[in-house]
A protein has these predicted regions:
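Long, low-complexity C-terminal extensions of enzymes
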Residues: 250, 258, 262, 267-355
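Rossmann-like NAD(P)-binding element
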Residues: 54-86, 90
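Internal alpha-helical scaffold of NAD(P)-dependent oxidoreductase catalytic cores
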Residues: 135-224
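Residues at the starts of beta-strands that form the adenosine-phosphate
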Residues: 4, 27, 88, 113, ...
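Glycine-rich, N-terminal phosphate-binding loop of Rossmann-like dinucleotide-binding domains
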Residues: 66-68, 95, 145
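Rossmann-like NAD(P)(H) cofactor-binding subdomain of soluble oxidoreductases
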Residues: 75-129
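Interdomain hinge/lid region at the active-site interface
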Residues: 207-281
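NAD(P)+-binding Rossmann beta1-loop-alpha1 motif at the extreme N-terminus of oxidoreductases
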Residues: 1-54, 62
């Protein structure tokens, strides 16, 4: 049961989370390295603290680190002596790279109380002024665990996400998460930025920009993100992003060669566009099943398997004491997501289309 949540960092992600939790009846205490958001945050019902020590004195059940990853070592060093006086508090974060954060958490001596998390929510904006509780509407979170993750602490974070935030959860290990995040988030930011860089370098850029419509808008939205934020995100997952960019460059070079070959490369060109058919079928199934419909954000005191408001079937999943991490990882690989718990060892999982 999560009664109080501590938020460290009131930017876009942390501020939106704090506002959403507060709106849903959770007591939220927060600390930000600059206090300029405090007046508005307190008007929204968030209890702002001057120091991390004051935040911990509020006895939060879960502390969520929403600070930039470059600030993580300093924040962890400041929290380490405070967490020792609050052994029941669980530590989590919202960073988009998990392996590096876990290493930093362990280096600070906080590994035993840590459970990684990453909400797949966000936009091209930043700062408290962009904070919006609806940012988390229908969001999926990745919770990252390893062999030493304490199950009780995992439940703290999972309950906060499913019950208090009203979102879904999958459970993965750090390496799997970081490779997947590079594929669906970090690498696309680079590709999107390359597109606008190509436009800027084009002598007819003003004509091209005037002709741009839906395709260009959709493919370049994330390029509008603060460049410093994008650079940091990409560099923090650099090995995975580098590997993907090299594979992407090879694909594009092959396509250029096939187009250069003219009629001789026609079959290869068709093969290029047909290769993604499994994803097209997946997206069609997702849309048909209703994943694009608004998620049911109404928490229930006693969840049970059935059919969600969005139209997805659900089932119960037993979570064993031994090997629970692998059980939940296999569930994620089947395309399932946790929506709640009947009791601590019985999860409710949503059955989603899979490729």
């Amino acid at each position: 049961m999560v009664d109080t949540v501590g938020i460290v960092g009131l930017g876009l992600i942390g501020g939106s989370l704090a506002r959403r939790l507060t709106e849903r009846g959770v007591r939220v205490v927060a600390w930000n390295h600059r206090q300029h958001p405090y007046a508005q945050a307190e008007a929204d019902g968030i209890f702002c603290k001057s120091t991390l020590s004051e935040l911990m004195d509020a006895e939060p059940d879960v502390v969520v680190l929403c600070n930039p990853l470059k600030a993580m070592p300093a924040i962890l060093a400041a929290l380490a002596p405070l967490m020792g006086d609050h052994p029941n508090t669980t530590l989590t974060d919202v960073g988009s790279v998990k392996g590096m954060v876990r290493d930093q958490v362990k280096a600070a001596g906080l590994g035993k109380c840590y459970v990684g998390a990453h909400p797949m929510a966000g936009n091209e904006l930043s700062g408290w002024q962009a904070a919006d509780p609806h940012l988390y509407d229908g969001a999926l979170w990745a919770i990252t665990v390893d062999e030493s993750t304490d199950y009780r602490r995992f439940l703290d974070v999972a309950a906060m996400i499913t019950k208090d935030v009203g979102n879904r959860v999958i459970v993965v290990d750090d390496e799997t998460h970081d490779k997947a995040a590079a594929m669906i988030s970090h690498m696309p930011h680079v590709v999107s930025t390359a597109l606008i860089n190509e436009l800027v370098a084009n002598p007819d850029r003003n004509i091209a920009a005037a002709l741009a419509a839906g395709c260009w808008r959709d493919m370049t939205r994330v390029s509008l993100t603060d460049p410093d934020r994008t650079r940091a995100m990409v560099e923090e997952d650099s090995l995975n992003v580098e590997a993907l960019l090299r594979r992407m460059a090879a694909r594009l070079t092959d396509m250029a060669d096939q187009l250069h070959a003219g009629a001789a490369g026609e079959q290869d060109v068709m093969g290029f566009f047909a290769e993604g058919d499994p994803f097209r079928r997946y997206k069609a199934a997702v849309t048909h099943a209703g994943i694009t419909a608004a998620q049911d954000d109404t928490a229930t005191a006693a969840p049970q398997a059935g059919t969600t408001a969005a139209g997805f079937p659900e089932r119960e999943l037993a979570v064993p004491e031994a090997g629970w991490q692998q059980t939940l990882l296999f569930s994620a690989r089947r395309g399932e997501a946790i929506t709640g718990f009947v009791h601590p060892r019985q999860a409710i999982v949503q059955l989603r289309p899979a490729m």
